Amino acid sequence: MHSQHRTARIALAVVLTAIPASLATAGVGYASTQASTAVKAGAGLDDPHKKEIAMELVSSAENSSLDWKAQYKYIEDIGDGRGYTGGIIGFCSGTGDMLELVQHYTDLEPGNILAKYLPALKKVNGSASHSGLGTPFTKDWATAAKDTVFQQAQNDERDRVYFDPAVSQAKADGLRALGQFAYYDAIVMHGPGNDPTSFGGIRKTAMKKARTPAQGGDETTYLNAFLDARKAAMLTEAAHDDTSRVDTEQRVFLKAGNLDLNPPLKWKTYGDPYVINS
Protein backbone atom coordinates (compact mmCIF):
# COMPACT_ATOMS: atom_id res chain seq x y z
CA MET A 1 0.00 0.00 0.00
CA HIS A 2 1.66 3.13 -1.22
CA SER A 3 -0.98 5.69 -2.12
CA GLN A 4 -1.23 9.21 -3.40
CA HIS A 5 -3.99 11.80 -3.33
CA ARG A 6 -6.71 10.51 -5.62
CA THR A 7 -7.07 13.26 -8.16
CA ALA A 8 -10.25 11.76 -9.55
CA ARG A 9 -12.03 12.77 -6.38
CA ILE A 10 -13.53 16.27 -6.38
CA ALA A 11 -12.69 18.12 -3.20
CA LEU A 12 -15.61 18.64 -0.88
CA ALA A 13 -16.47 21.91 0.79
CA VAL A 14 -15.74 22.48 4.45
CA VAL A 15 -17.32 19.78 6.56
CA LEU A 16 -18.71 21.46 9.62
CA THR A 17 -19.20 18.34 11.68
CA ALA A 18 -18.11 14.75 11.34
CA ILE A 19 -20.50 12.43 13.17
CA PRO A 20 -21.06 9.32 11.05
CA ALA A 21 -23.69 6.69 11.58
CA SER A 22 -21.21 4.27 13.05
CA LEU A 23 -17.65 4.27 14.26
CA ALA A 24 -14.60 2.39 13.06
CA THR A 25 -15.34 -0.13 15.77
CA ALA A 26 -18.93 -1.22 15.51
CA GLY A 27 -21.33 -0.77 18.36
CA VAL A 28 -19.57 2.06 20.17
CA GLY A 29 -21.10 5.54 20.08
CA TYR A 30 -19.55 8.97 20.25
CA ALA A 31 -19.15 10.52 23.67
CA SER A 32 -22.46 12.28 24.14
CA THR A 33 -21.56 14.74 26.87
CA GLN A 34 -18.70 17.06 27.64
CA ALA A 35 -17.93 15.02 30.73
CA SER A 36 -17.60 11.73 28.85
CA THR A 37 -15.54 13.41 26.14
CA ALA A 38 -13.22 14.82 28.77
CA VAL A 39 -12.66 11.37 30.23
CA LYS A 40 -11.33 10.27 26.83
CA ALA A 41 -9.14 13.33 26.35
CA GLY A 42 -5.92 11.34 26.75
CA ALA A 43 -7.14 8.26 24.93
CA GLY A 44 -4.97 6.47 22.41
CA LEU A 45 -5.76 6.23 18.72
CA ASP A 46 -7.31 2.81 19.29
CA ASP A 47 -10.11 4.42 21.30
CA PRO A 48 -13.18 4.18 19.01
CA HIS A 49 -13.70 7.94 18.88
CA LYS A 50 -10.04 8.64 18.11
CA LYS A 51 -9.94 5.83 15.57
CA GLU A 52 -12.87 7.37 13.74
CA ILE A 53 -11.01 10.68 13.67
CA ALA A 54 -7.95 8.91 12.25
CA MET A 55 -10.01 7.31 9.49
CA GLU A 56 -11.49 10.69 8.56
CA LEU A 57 -8.10 12.42 8.55
CA VAL A 58 -6.65 9.82 6.19
CA SER A 59 -9.73 9.99 3.97
CA SER A 60 -9.40 13.76 3.66
CA ALA A 61 -5.99 13.23 2.07
CA GLU A 62 -6.79 10.08 0.12
CA ASN A 63 -10.29 10.91 -1.10
CA SER A 64 -10.96 14.62 -0.46
CA SER A 65 -13.78 13.56 1.84
CA LEU A 66 -14.27 12.71 5.50
CA ASP A 67 -16.69 9.93 4.52
CA TRP A 68 -14.21 7.07 4.66
CA LYS A 69 -16.95 4.42 4.61
CA ALA A 70 -17.89 5.55 1.09
CA GLN A 71 -14.48 4.31 -0.09
CA TYR A 72 -15.00 0.54 0.17
CA LYS A 73 -16.06 0.63 -3.50
CA TYR A 74 -13.25 2.89 -4.70
CA ILE A 75 -10.82 1.42 -7.24
CA GLU A 76 -8.68 2.92 -10.01
CA ASP A 77 -5.16 2.97 -11.38
CA ILE A 78 -3.71 6.29 -10.23
CA GLY A 79 -0.64 5.92 -12.43
CA ASP A 80 1.93 5.43 -9.68
CA GLY A 81 3.27 2.13 -10.98
CA ARG A 82 1.44 0.04 -8.38
CA GLY A 83 -1.46 -1.18 -10.47
CA TYR A 84 -4.94 -0.74 -9.06
CA THR A 85 -5.47 1.21 -5.85
CA GLY A 86 -8.72 0.41 -4.05
CA GLY A 87 -10.69 0.44 -0.85
CA ILE A 88 -10.59 2.37 2.39
CA ILE A 89 -6.84 2.83 2.63
CA GLY A 90 -5.73 2.14 -0.93
CA PHE A 91 -4.90 -1.55 -1.18
CA CYS A 92 -2.68 -2.01 -4.27
CA SER A 93 -2.62 -4.86 -6.76
CA GLY A 94 1.09 -4.30 -7.28
CA THR A 95 2.21 -4.32 -3.65
CA GLY A 96 0.59 -7.48 -2.31
CA ASP A 97 -1.93 -6.07 0.11
CA MET A 98 -4.83 -6.24 -2.37
CA LEU A 99 -4.01 -9.91 -2.89
CA GLU A 100 -3.98 -10.46 0.87
CA LEU A 101 -7.30 -8.62 1.18
CA VAL A 102 -9.05 -10.74 -1.45
CA GLN A 103 -7.57 -13.89 0.09
CA HIS A 104 -8.91 -12.87 3.51
CA TYR A 105 -12.31 -12.09 1.98
CA THR A 106 -12.32 -15.52 0.39
CA ASP A 107 -11.38 -17.15 3.70
CA LEU A 108 -14.39 -15.42 5.26
CA GLU A 109 -16.73 -16.02 2.33
CA PRO A 110 -15.61 -18.77 -0.07
CA GLY A 111 -16.88 -18.38 -3.60
CA ASN A 112 -17.30 -14.62 -3.36
CA ILE A 113 -17.37 -12.51 -6.53
CA LEU A 114 -13.66 -11.61 -6.27
CA ALA A 115 -12.31 -15.08 -5.47
CA LYS A 116 -11.88 -15.94 -9.16
CA TYR A 117 -9.30 -13.15 -9.48
CA LEU A 118 -6.88 -14.61 -6.95
CA PRO A 119 -4.67 -16.28 -9.62
CA ALA A 120 -4.44 -13.01 -11.56
CA LEU A 121 -3.68 -11.00 -8.43
CA LYS A 122 -0.86 -13.40 -7.62
CA LYS A 123 0.59 -12.96 -11.13
CA VAL A 124 0.48 -9.15 -11.15
CA ASN A 125 1.85 -8.76 -7.62
CA GLY A 126 4.99 -6.64 -7.81
CA SER A 127 4.00 -4.97 -11.07
CA ALA A 128 1.65 -2.35 -12.50
CA SER A 129 -0.01 -4.93 -14.78
CA HIS A 130 -3.78 -5.29 -15.14
CA SER A 131 -3.44 -8.72 -16.75
CA GLY A 132 -6.41 -10.92 -15.90
CA LEU A 133 -8.13 -8.05 -14.08
CA GLY A 134 -9.33 -5.02 -16.07
CA THR A 135 -12.90 -3.74 -16.25
CA PRO A 136 -14.54 -7.00 -15.10
CA PHE A 137 -12.45 -6.87 -11.92
CA THR A 138 -13.20 -3.23 -11.15
CA LYS A 139 -16.93 -3.80 -11.71
CA ASP A 140 -16.91 -6.86 -9.47
CA TRP A 141 -14.96 -4.90 -6.84
CA ALA A 142 -17.74 -2.29 -6.75
CA THR A 143 -20.30 -5.07 -6.41
CA ALA A 144 -18.34 -6.75 -3.62
CA ALA A 145 -18.14 -3.43 -1.77
CA LYS A 146 -21.86 -3.73 -1.02
CA ASP A 147 -21.15 -6.97 0.86
CA THR A 148 -20.64 -6.35 4.58
CA VAL A 149 -18.24 -9.31 4.66
CA PHE A 150 -15.96 -7.55 2.15
CA GLN A 151 -16.24 -4.35 4.16
CA GLN A 152 -15.21 -6.28 7.27
CA ALA A 153 -12.32 -7.86 5.36
CA GLN A 154 -11.07 -4.38 4.44
CA ASN A 155 -11.36 -3.27 8.07
CA ASP A 156 -9.53 -6.39 9.23
CA GLU A 157 -6.62 -5.97 6.82
CA ARG A 158 -6.36 -2.26 7.55
CA ASP A 159 -6.00 -3.06 11.22
CA ARG A 160 -3.73 -6.09 10.83
CA VAL A 161 -1.24 -4.59 8.38
CA TYR A 162 -1.36 -0.87 9.14
CA PHE A 163 -3.34 0.47 12.07
CA ASP A 164 -2.48 -1.99 14.83
CA PRO A 165 1.29 -2.16 14.10
CA ALA A 166 1.52 1.65 13.82
CA VAL A 167 -0.32 2.30 17.07
CA SER A 168 1.59 -0.43 18.89
CA GLN A 169 4.96 0.97 17.79
CA ALA A 170 3.93 4.52 18.64
CA LYS A 171 2.83 3.51 22.12
CA ALA A 172 6.12 1.68 22.62
CA ASP A 173 7.88 4.90 21.62
CA GLY A 174 5.89 6.80 24.25
CA LEU A 175 3.75 8.76 21.80
CA ARG A 176 0.22 9.98 22.41
CA ALA A 177 -2.64 10.00 19.89
CA LEU A 178 -1.13 12.56 17.50
CA GLY A 179 2.12 10.62 17.27
CA GLN A 180 0.17 7.41 16.86
CA PHE A 181 -1.68 9.01 13.97
CA ALA A 182 1.56 10.29 12.42
CA TYR A 183 2.85 6.71 12.42
CA TYR A 184 -0.39 5.36 10.97
CA ASP A 185 -0.60 7.92 8.18
CA ALA A 186 3.03 7.22 7.30
CA ILE A 187 2.59 3.46 7.13
CA VAL A 188 -0.56 3.87 5.01
CA MET A 189 1.30 5.91 2.41
CA HIS A 190 4.79 4.40 2.54
CA GLY A 191 4.05 0.86 3.64
CA PRO A 192 5.69 -1.21 6.37
CA GLY A 193 9.32 -2.15 5.95
CA ASN A 194 12.77 -0.82 6.78
CA ASP A 195 14.06 0.68 3.54
CA PRO A 196 14.70 4.46 3.75
CA THR A 197 11.34 5.52 2.34
CA SER A 198 9.19 2.95 4.16
CA PHE A 199 7.77 3.49 7.63
CA GLY A 200 10.62 1.73 9.42
CA GLY A 201 13.23 3.75 7.56
CA ILE A 202 11.44 7.03 8.24
CA ARG A 203 11.29 6.21 11.95
CA LYS A 204 14.97 5.26 11.96
CA THR A 205 15.89 8.57 10.32
CA ALA A 206 13.88 10.49 12.91
CA MET A 207 15.51 8.61 15.78
CA LYS A 208 18.93 9.71 14.53
CA LYS A 209 17.80 13.32 15.01
CA ALA A 210 15.83 13.09 18.25
CA ARG A 211 15.09 10.67 21.06
CA THR A 212 11.62 9.23 21.46
CA PRO A 213 9.74 9.94 24.70
CA ALA A 214 10.40 6.32 25.67
CA GLN A 215 14.12 7.12 25.38
CA GLY A 216 13.68 10.20 27.54
CA GLY A 217 13.23 12.65 24.69
CA ASP A 218 10.74 15.45 24.23
CA GLU A 219 7.60 14.33 22.40
CA THR A 220 7.19 17.48 20.30
CA THR A 221 10.86 17.54 19.32
CA TYR A 222 10.73 13.92 18.25
CA LEU A 223 7.50 14.34 16.29
CA ASN A 224 8.97 17.30 14.43
CA ALA A 225 11.93 15.09 13.51
CA PHE A 226 9.58 12.32 12.40
CA LEU A 227 7.51 14.68 10.25
CA ASP A 228 10.72 16.09 8.73
CA ALA A 229 11.82 12.57 7.83
CA ARG A 230 8.37 11.72 6.50
CA LYS A 231 8.32 14.81 4.29
CA ALA A 232 11.78 14.02 2.93
CA ALA A 233 10.62 10.50 2.06
CA MET A 234 7.54 11.86 0.30
CA LEU A 235 9.64 14.21 -1.82
CA THR A 236 11.66 11.32 -3.26
CA GLU A 237 8.63 10.27 -5.33
CA ALA A 238 6.65 12.42 -7.77
CA ALA A 239 3.37 10.81 -6.72
CA HIS A 240 3.86 12.17 -3.19
CA ASP A 241 5.36 15.57 -3.92
CA ASP A 242 2.41 17.41 -2.38
CA THR A 243 3.23 17.26 1.33
CA SER A 244 0.17 19.09 2.63
CA ARG A 245 -0.98 16.12 4.72
CA VAL A 246 2.15 16.82 6.76
CA ASP A 247 2.47 20.61 6.38
CA THR A 248 -1.12 21.80 6.75
CA GLU A 249 -2.53 18.89 8.74
CA GLN A 250 -0.25 17.03 11.15
CA ARG A 251 2.19 19.90 11.64
CA VAL A 252 -0.73 22.22 12.40
CA PHE A 253 -1.89 19.95 15.21
CA LEU A 254 1.66 19.63 16.51
CA LYS A 255 2.28 23.38 16.52
CA ALA A 256 -0.97 23.82 18.45
CA GLY A 257 0.31 21.40 21.09
CA ASN A 258 -2.61 19.03 20.44
CA LEU A 259 -0.67 15.86 21.22
CA ASP A 260 -3.85 14.03 22.22
CA LEU A 261 -5.51 14.83 18.88
CA ASN A 262 -8.58 16.24 20.56
CA PRO A 263 -11.31 17.95 18.53
CA PRO A 264 -12.15 20.49 17.36
CA LEU A 265 -9.65 19.93 14.57
CA LYS A 266 -9.15 22.26 11.61
CA TRP A 267 -6.77 21.46 8.76
CA LYS A 268 -6.24 21.50 5.01
CA THR A 269 -5.13 18.83 2.59
CA TYR A 270 -4.31 19.81 -0.99
CA GLY A 271 -5.69 23.27 -0.18
CA ASP A 272 -9.13 22.00 0.83
CA PRO A 273 -10.35 22.93 4.35
CA TYR A 274 -11.84 20.44 6.79
CA VAL A 275 -13.23 20.58 10.31
CA ILE A 276 -14.05 17.92 12.87
CA ASN A 277 -15.89 19.65 15.68
CA SER A 278 -16.46 16.74 18.02
UniProtKB/Swiss-Prot annotation:
<feature type="active site" description="Nucleophile">
    <location>
        <position position="80"/>
    </location>
</feature>
<feature type="signal peptide">
    <location>
        <begin position="1"/>
        <end position="40"/>
    </location>
</feature>
<feature type="active site" description="Proton donor">
    <location>
        <position position="62"/>
    </location>
</feature>
<keyword id="KW-0964">Secreted</keyword>
<keyword id="KW-0378">Hydrolase</keyword>
<dbReference type="GO" id="GO:0005576">
    <property type="term" value="C:extracellular region"/>
</dbReference>
<dbReference type="GO" id="GO:0016977">
    <property type="term" value="F:chitosanase activity"/>
</dbReference>
<keyword id="KW-0326">Glycosidase</keyword>
<dbReference type="InterPro" id="IPR023099">
    <property type="entry name" value="Glyco_hydro_46_N"/>
</dbReference>
<protein>
    <recommendedName>
        <fullName>Chitosanase</fullName>
        <ecNumber>3.2.1.132</ecNumber>
    </recommendedName>
</protein>
<dbReference type="Pfam" id="PF01374">
    <property type="entry name" value="Glyco_hydro_46"/>
</dbReference>
<dbReference type="InterPro" id="IPR000400">
    <property type="entry name" value="Glyco_hydro_46"/>
</dbReference>
<comment type="similarity">
    <text>Belongs to the glycosyl hydrolase 46 family.</text>
</comment>
<dbReference type="InterPro" id="IPR023346">
    <property type="entry name" value="Lysozyme-like_dom_sf"/>
</dbReference>
<dbReference type="GO" id="GO:0005975">
    <property type="term" value="P:carbohydrate metabolic process"/>
</dbReference>
<comment type="function">
    <text>Aids in the defense against invading fungal pathogens by degrading their cell wall chitosan.</text>
</comment>
<keyword id="KW-0732">Signal</keyword>
